[in-house]
Every structure is written in C-alpha cells, then in structure tokens.
C-alpha cells in the first residue's frame, strides 16, 4: 500500500474511492458505492490485510456498514447492521465515526445520541458495556 495513495470520500451520494500511484500526478476515481445513500464516515483499516469501511445511513433501511477487501474496487454490506440491544430500547440514528478497535476484527463506532461502542464486524462478541452491537 506504500506505493500508492488511497483516499476515501463520504458524500450524500455514497462513498467514492480515489487512488493514485507515486508520484500522484492524477487520481482514478471510483464510485459511488452505496449509491444515493449518505456516507458520514470512512475508515482505511491497515491492521493485517487492508480493508476499507464506510457507514451508510438509509432513511428507509437504516444503518449499514460497507466493507471493501479489495481496496475500494467493490464494497459489500457486513453480515449484520449496527444496532443497540433490544433491551436498551433505543434506535440507532447515525454512525458519525468509525475506528479500528483493539482486536484484529473489532470496529468501533461513534453514533448519534452520544454513545460509542463496537464489536466484531461479523456481528458477534460485543466489546463495549451494553451500548452498541456491530
């Protein structure tokens, strides 16, 4: 990844990925991925095999986390959508920030309502108190 630069861009129309090889005279732009859905946060996760993540907020279908394992050539939705546990009685409004967690597969999310939480991207083993399932 050191021989090129990758830039992720979250917009109201989805996520775009721009990349360039050295000496960065021009960038190739791909996207939008998750078209028509606002993306408020993106993350380039360099732990192990590099991955790109984007949070998408669809007013009808809710929150999704998009993942790219090929450095932005394509994106897929993670197996589970982020959500509060049912017993908390809260709905997730938006993911404002994504951050790599302490474990190899942990992804932390900063969400509206002033909560942060995280867990394994596949949807198991939550790594926060009782706040947010990813």
What are these regions (language model features)?
Residues 1-134:
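Extracellular glycan-interacting surfaces
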